[in-house]
Structures are given as C-alpha cells and as structure tokens.
Amino acid sequence: MAKINELLRESTTTNSNSIGRPNLVALTRATTKLIYSDIVATQRTNQPVAAFYGIKYLNPDNEFTFKTGATYAGEAGYVDREQITELTEESKLTLNKGDLFKYNNIVYKVLEDTPFATIEESDLELALQIAIVLLKVRLFSDAASTSKFESSDSEIADARFQINKWQTAVKSRKLKTGITVELAQDLEANGFDAPNFLEDLLATEMADEINKDILQSLITVSKRYKVTGITDSGFIDLSYASAPEAGRSLYRMVCEMVSHIQKESTYTATFCVASARAAAILAASGWLKHKPEDDKYLSQNAYGFLANGLPLYCDTNSPLDYVIVGVVENIGEKEIVGSIFYAPYTEGLDLDDPEHVGAFKVVVDPESLQPSIGLLVRYALSANPYTVAKDEKEARIIDGGDMDKMAGRSDLSVLLGVKLPKIIIDE
C-alpha cells in the first residue's frame, strides 16, 4: 500500500512527466485468490515467450503406452509379432486351441478349437469381447521364460520416450481507473484506506477477466463427450426430467467422464466445473456435499465435493449450461499435467512469491495533472499442440495459444453440454 501512496505523492510533486519515473509495484493478493488455480496448470515465466515441455512414453509401434493393452517385453515380443496372424473375418474361422493371433497390436491365445464358430455377432471387435468373456480366448501378456533373453541373438523391446517443446507468446491485459487527489482525500476522510481500496478494485476486476479467459478457454479446448443414443451431439437433454432423475443422469455422466479421462490419459480427474444451473442440479440431487470438516481440504472457490470425491466449481458467467471434468496434477517439482497451462509473466521478480501476478503504474494526465492508476497483467495461456498435430513437423508450427486450432483437442478435460428448461423472467 505504501507503494501506491508513493505513486500518488510522486504524481503531484513532480514538475514534469519526463522527470518523474513511474514506480513499479509488485503485485496484489486479491488477484491470486480469485484465479482458478485448481483447474489450470500454472507455470510462471519471466520470458516474453513461455516455453512448455511434454513427455511421450511410446511402445515399439510408436503408440502411447497408456492407450493400448499391448505388451512387448514378454513372451510375445515385437519381433515375435511378425509371425502372429492378424484377426480378420477369414482368419477367425481357422483358429484352433493354442494358436496366437493379434488384433489392434494386442496378442490373444485361443483356448478351444474354432472359438468364434458359435458367436453370431457380426462386429469383429464385439465378437472378440464375447469370446474373452466366454473364455474361448484370453489376453496373452505372459512374461517370457528365463532362457528367452539369455541367448546372444535375443531381441529386446525398446523402451521409447520423446520430449517435445512448444512455445506460446505472453499477452497482456490492462485496466485503469482515474482518481483525483481530492477523491483519495475524501475516501480517507470517510474511513476508507484509499490505496487499499484502489488496489483491490483493479485487482478484483482483473482477476475476473483472467478467470473468464481460463474458464472459456477450458470450454474451448475440452473434448466433447458423446455417447451413442444418450449424448450423440455432445448434449444431454434434461429438459423433460424430474429433479431427482436429472441429478442422477447428470451425475452418472460425470462419473463416466472421469473413467473416460482415466482410460485416455491414465490420469484420474481432479476437478469438475459446471454452469450455475448444472451445479444446482447436482446439488439438488444429493450428490454434492459440503460438510464443515471438508473446509480444510476444499478450495475456497469450490462449490463442494461430489460423491465421487471431485471438487465442483461453479461457472456463473457461462452463456451455456455444461459440465466439464478435467485433470490438474502436480507430479514432483517440475512435472505438471493439465488441460491448459497458465503462465503468468513476472517481469524478473521473485518467482517463488505466489503473489507476483501483475504490476501497478501511475500515469499523469498532462492537461488536468490528475493521476490514473493502471494494472497491467501479462500471461500466456496454452494447450498442448501435440494433441492436435498429425505429425511432428506440423506440431512445430502450431501455436499452443491459438484456441482456434486447439478447439476440442484436449484429452485431459471433457465437456458435456446440458439442455435445461428455459427460465422465464418477467419484465
């Protein structure tokens, strides 16, 4: 607060704008408290271009290891697969007990002769699932016998990884408020702390701007959750349902979205964001709890805990009704996982100070000699472009902050639109 006093004093005692140098102030606590840090991965930067790194864990077929059930380091190794038959409509009729076959790079073993003979399902993938349930075939993930890797010519599967880098330019937001010295004196005379009042005014409005940017970007990059016959268009229709039925249906979809994220990324969802009405439906259904003893675990911005353990955040400004399930995970000191990354630019200040978010400046109007106090915030907001690109060459030219290209591409957050009865407001 003393810094703003110093700014005001400087603006009224300096004879010329060219002589007085604007005083750079650190930052404000109010902004930090209002930013939804629980739904975005935060990585501070002191460079005008924020750099992010991503690690891919790949199998010998250059697939993400977590997206396939295939194993390569055991009895059915990478080279062994070249001799294993691929399952097709024709080959499935020739299989006998003890045979190995592969489907989508996963190896299976036949447990009885002609395992598909009595399965009438025409869809090959579903027929295979039925055969597994009926114990006609099994997944073949066996470890190799010790002797397999003792020979000099044994083939050992490669453990592959790839580190990618992408960059996003830091951008700016700026707000100002005009104040006369007389107004500041009147505020003080009426019991207000004028510097504190002005600081909180600008900081709160700036935090609201950043929050909207984060939430609306999260809506943009999240993949749409579509289920045949239920949410074909990415919307669930609750306009006809009773309150208990609507709550159960929406909570069920939230739980399915949690499982979807875990299957697609191996990470467990850590938060749920919903529009005001969607959050109210979850609360009315009884699936939302907020006990006094939960306060020490619950973020001050959260609405409460869902029954599956996810904190629920309420988006009160959204033009649509929706629910998003997503991941923000801090793994160790350097590794952060999230659907989008928020990188506040700290202008060379202490990166360990969590309050470093923006900077105050005073500019004096040369005509009235009255000061205007402004708050400038710089930050980068980015999604991972490697979830978009078809290949590495294309990925290098994609800007992670280009929300047009990032739309609907993130595997770490899933959105479901919610159709509700329209509210009638009397004029």
From Swiss-Prot:
Q: Which residues cross the membrane?
A: none
Coiled-coil positions: none
Main function: Capsid protein that self-associates to form pentons, building the capsid in association with hexamers of the major capsid protein and one dodecamer of the portal protein. The capsid vertex protein self-associates to form 11 pentons, building the T=13 laevo capsid in association with 160 hexamers of the major capsid protein.
Gene3D superfamilies attached to this UniProt entry: 2.10.10.40, 3.30.2320.40
Sorted alphabetically, the Gene Ontology cellular component annotations on this record are: viral capsid
Gene name per UniProt: 24
- In this UniProt entry, which residues are annotated as the site Cleavage? E10, S11
Q: How does it assemble?
A: Homopentamer. Interacts with the portal protein. Interacts with the major capsid protein that forms 160 hexamers.
User: What does the entry's PTM section describe?
Assistant: Proteolytic cleavage at the N-terminus by the prohead core protein protease gives rise to the mature capsid vertex protein.
Taxonomy, superkingdom: Viruses
State the similarity comment. Belongs to the Tevenvirinae capsid vertex family.
Q: Which UniProt keywords apply?
A: Capsid protein, Late protein, Virion
HAMAP family tied to this protein: CAPSID_P_T4
Q: What is this protein called?
A: Capsid vertex protein
